[in-house]
């Protein structure tokens, strides 16, 4: 089994609440202890725009995975869960993919998924998911806020501000994508 990469350099968070699903990510790219770029775009719409996702890990590896996920979405009629499972199968069996160092959060109207560096597909509990170096900070903050009146985007912004205050590899230059949710 391959060793999981050390995640440093980003925080990605997703919250599903009140008929919306939001994926938000910071823009910091770090090489060691140096900030190389403060405003990278690690969150984007995929395929025809019905799926949104964000990545943590090696940028080139993440774009490879985004491209492959988009192909799987095309092959499976835009069904995110099916496309993610098929990508995970490839990830586990393809020698090249097994060496990629990236994780992703992807979401559509129906489901939010975490795709791990081991080829796992996880559906988070309570509609909140986070990855990356500041992921645990953002996840904790979002879970604490989700039961209150705030909407999904407000929760994401506040949780990311907390993560940026606590994680030196996370900043407050945010990219946000939102979809209407079935739930």
From Swiss-Prot:
Active site (catalytic residues): 10
Enzyme class: hydrolase
Gene3D superfamilies membership: Glutamine Phosphoribosylpyrophosphate, subunit 1, domain 1
Substrates-to-products reaction catalysed: ATP-dependent cleavage of peptide bonds with broad specificity
EC numbers, comma separated: 3.4.25.2
Record InterPro entries: ATP-dep_Prtase_HsIV_su (IPR022281), Ntn_hydrolases_N (IPR029055), Proteasome_sua/b (IPR001353), Proteasome_suB-type (IPR023333)
Main location: cytoplasm
Highest rank taxon of the organism: Bacteria
UniProt entry keywords in alphabetical sequence: Allosteric enzyme, Cytoplasm, Hydrolase, Metal-binding, Protease, Sodium, Threonine protease
A single GO cellular-component term on record: HslUV protease complex
Entry's Gene Ontology molecular function annotations: metal ion binding; threonine-type endopeptidase activity
Sites where the protein binds Na(+): 164, 167, 170
Keyword Disulfide bond: no
UniProt key word Metal-binding: yes
Location(s) in or outside the cell: Cytoplasm
Gene Ontology BP, a term: proteolysis involved in protein catabolic process
UniProt note on regulation of activity: Allosterically activated by HslU binding.
PANTHER family xrefs: ATP-DEPENDENT PROTEASE SUBUNIT HSLV, METALLOPROTEASE TLDD
Membership in a protein family: Belongs to the peptidase T1B family. HslV subfamily.
Quaternary organization: A double ring-shaped homohexamer of HslV is capped on each side by a ring-shaped HslU homohexamer. The assembly of the HslU/HslV complex is dependent on binding of ATP.
Stated name of the protein: ATP-dependent protease subunit HslV
Encoding gene per record: hslV
């Amino acid at each position: 089994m391959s060793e999981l990469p050390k995640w440093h350099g980003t925080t990605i968070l997703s919250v599903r609440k009140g008929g919306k699903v939001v994926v938000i990510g910071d823009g910091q790219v770090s090489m060691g202890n140096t900030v190389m770029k403060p405003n990278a775009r690690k969150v984007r719409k995929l395929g025809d725009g019905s799926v949104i996702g964000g990545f943590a890990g090696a940028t080139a590896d993440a774009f490879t995975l985004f491209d492959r996920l988009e192909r799987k979405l095309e092959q499976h009629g835009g069904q995110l869960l099916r496309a993610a499972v098929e990508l995970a199968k490839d990830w586990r069996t393809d020698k090249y993919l097994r060496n990629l160092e990236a994780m992703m959060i992807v979401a559509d109207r129906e489901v939010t998924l975490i795709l791990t560096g081991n080829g796992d597909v996880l559906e988070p509990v309570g509609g909140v998911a986070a990855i990356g170096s500041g992921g645990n900070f953002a996840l904790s903050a979002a879970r604490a806020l989700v039961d209150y009146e705030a909407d999904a985007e407000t929760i994401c912004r506040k949780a990311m501000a907390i993560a940026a205050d606590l994680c030196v590899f996370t900043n407050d230059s945010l990219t946000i994508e939102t979809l209407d949710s079935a739930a």
